[in-house]
């Protein structure tokens, strides 16, 4: 399942390519056809993310609520007038591109970003956000949603309810509502006897945080994953600020890098990490390998159905 930075990055790309434009909306697969017809020919005002949830706000005051789940993908691809490949639940392209003129395509930087894929386990799959398709500077693009957990049409009031179910999002650090949620999360943290590793994965506490950021933040701060929430709350601001920093980097660069400069491949004269997830990390999916800081073996356990990684020496 993609972590929150992937969804925020996707929202940014959708706004860059389609924001403020009149859109053609369809459901080639057919499962969203009736809803698509209600927003076809209307303006996409904005795409915005909260945690792992994506909201596409149309001028008709109707909102498409998307959650990719474990296998969903939302790709920005070259526009083609015939039916796109695969089981496309939702298809978007600019109305002006039906004539093939003046399309706004991805920037070179965005094209070079390539596919962003995340996986919750070591198996193949995951969620892709952006295809590394070769495009000319004025080639039309489309957005195609495949295999989501949710794709539904909701009202503004229903969107507010959905956001109200979520916790604080580290990628919305200055949002007034999010700041209120953050303070409430901190209050709940001080009363919780659950482990901090469990709380970090709870979307009602930390919206958008997934398995990778959970493991890496706890390592970077030297916190034992079994530490109770009420104990870890003494370091709540450190946890929050590290999440803000790491997830903002992930949103900007399209990959998760968590190692500090002194532990980079160049500084340590070691080979770069080779993993489908990409990026340099301390413990995630490094079970049995030497810790980059102390040299002891990275540990692994399945906790609440999810893989947890930590260094028993650095995280006492």
Where are these regions (language model features)?
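Catalytic cores of large soluble enzymes that bind and process phosphate-bearing ligands
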Residues: 2, 177, 235
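Basic, nucleic-acid-binding surfaces and adjacent catalytic neighborhoods in DNA/RNA-processing proteins
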Residues: 22-35, 127, 132, 185-316
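Extended, highly charged segments
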Residues: 1-62, 89-98, 105-111, 117-118, ...
């Amino acid at each position: 399942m993609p972590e929150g930075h992937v969804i925020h990055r996707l929202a940014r790309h959708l706004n860059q390519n389609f924001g403020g434009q009149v859109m053609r909306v369809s459901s080639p697969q057919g499962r969203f056809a009736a809803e698509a017809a209600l927003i076809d020919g209307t303006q996409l005002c904005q795409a915005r993310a909260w945690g792992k949830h994506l909201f596409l706000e149309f001028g008709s005051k109707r909102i498409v609520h998307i959650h990719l789940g474990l296998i969903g993908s939302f790709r920005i691809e070259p526009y083609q007038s015939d039916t796109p490949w695969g089981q496309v639940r939702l298809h978007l392209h600019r109305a002006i591109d039906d004539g093939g003129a003046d399309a706004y395509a991805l920037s070179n930087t965005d094209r070079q970003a390539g596919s962003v894929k995340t996986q919750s386990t070591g198996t193949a799959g995951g969620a892709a956000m952006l295809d590394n398709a070769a495009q000319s500077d004025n080639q039309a693009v489309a957005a195609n949603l495949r295999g989501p957990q949710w794709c539904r049409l909701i009202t503004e009031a229903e969107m507010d309810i959905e956001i109200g179910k979520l916790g604080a999002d580290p990628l919305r650090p200055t949002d007034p509502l999010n700041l209120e949620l953050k303070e409430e999360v901190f209050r709940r943290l001080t009363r919780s006897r659950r482990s901090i590793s469990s709380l970090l994965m709870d979307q009602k506490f930390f919206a958008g945080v997934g398995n990778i950021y959970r493991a890496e933040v706890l390592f970077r701060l030297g916190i034992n994953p079994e530490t109770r929430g009420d104990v870890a709350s003494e370091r709540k601001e450190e946890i929050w600020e590290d999440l803000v920093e790491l997830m903002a980097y992930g949103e900007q660069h399209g990959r998760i890098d968590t190692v500090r400069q002194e532990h980079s491949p160049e500084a340590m004269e070691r080979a770069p990490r080779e993993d489908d997830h990409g990026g340099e990390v301390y413990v995630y999916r490094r079970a049995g390998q030497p810790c980059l800081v102390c040299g002891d073996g990275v540990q692994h356990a399945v906790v609440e159905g999810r893989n947890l990684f930590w260094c028993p020496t650095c995280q006492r």
